[in-house]
Amino acid sequence: NEEIKELYPFLSHEIEYIYNPLDCNNIIEQGNENIEKMTSYEKELIESDYFLAISRLDAVQKDFETLIEGYSILKNKGIKEKLYIIGEGNGRVKIEKMIEEKNSGEDVILLGEKKNPYVWMKYSKLFIHSSKYEGFGVVLLEALMLDKFVISSNCPTGPTEILTNPKAGELFDVGDANQLAEKVLKVLYDKDYQKELLKNIQLKKKEFELSEIAEKFHKIIEESM
């Protein structure tokens, strides 16, 4: 929204923006999939305490270096949660090397592609997104639909728009692993703050419901007639 206004300042007072709706019910339904159908290994993993990232394994754009460094800082501070990463890509070997260099092989697990990532999202303690840039960042919304706490880089474009007004998650500066770790600890251990975030997450979810989007379309059509 803000980027469009910057490109066309002379039209800023006339711009109306409408989000694409999300199929919230489908996301929730897949998140509630019966884990008893999983292999014993998958079931053991999903029943553990873990943070989750879902991303194409692109070491540059997705900035796995910051993600893995931030997680290493958290481990040094004593957290017990593991880090699972869902996705595949040509950066896998480079990312595996990053994990090895941090001696995190037992704690950072590359799960590959998953037919249903939402059930893994549902069971995670929080969702981390470390990209240097994004088109919009729909995966952040998908995490919110499952009432997950979200920690995201403040990258262009999307995260700020998704996680603010009201504040529905935490943002850290792109490439700042220390700040990433600080934000995770804040969300992980501040129970009062968790309640505040959950309240705001419910408000944010409504913005992307089909009924809400349809109402905005209806209003714009009426005003233009």
Regions found by a protein language model. Give the residues of each.
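A short, active-site helix/loop in glycosyltransferases that binds the activated sugar's phosphate group
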Residues: 1-17, 22-26
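Conserved acidic donor-binding segment of nucleotide-sugar-dependent glycosyltransferases
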Residues: 165-177, 186-191
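A conserved mid-protein helix/loop that constitutes part of the nucleotide-sugar donor-binding site
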Residues: 58-73, 90-96, 138
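A structural motif in glycosyltransferase catalytic domains
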Residues: 51, 63-70, 83, 180, ...
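Aromatic "clamp/platform" in nucleotide-sugar-dependent glycosyltransferases that forms part
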Residues: 113, 132
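Short acidic/histidine- and often glycine-rich active-site loop of Leloir-type glycosyltransferases
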Residues: 142, 155-166, 170-171
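A short, well-ordered alpha-helix in the C-terminal region of glycosyltransferases
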Residues: 179, 186, 193-207, 215-219
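Short hydrophobic beta-strand element within catalytic cores of glycosyltransferases
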Residues: 149-153
